[in-house]
Amino acid sequence: MDDRMSNVDPKLLELLVCPLTKGRLSYDRTHNELISESARLAYPIRDGVPIMLISEARKIEE
């Protein structure tokens, strides 16, 4: 099974929030991640499942 999602359901994005800040997330299709701009974290999506663990998130450097 491909671990890339072709699309993230907009309703899912409305429901999910960053576990650290409780802020909104955006989908980064290039890296297949959910981005929390306020926390500067990127949460991976594996096998179509968002991994919403702070310990699994990648820090955004820019």
Curated annotation (Swiss-Prot):
Domain of life the protein comes from: Bacteria
Pfam families in alphabetical order: Trm112p (PF03966)
SUPFAM superfamilies: Trm112p-like (SSF158997)
InterPro entries tied to this protein: Trm112-like
GO CC terms, sorted: cytosol
Family affiliation: Belongs to the UPF0434 family.
HAMAP family, per database record: UPF0434 (MF_01187)
Protein name: UPF0434 protein Atu3696
Organism for this UniProt entry: Agrobacterium fabrum (strain C58 / ATCC 33970)
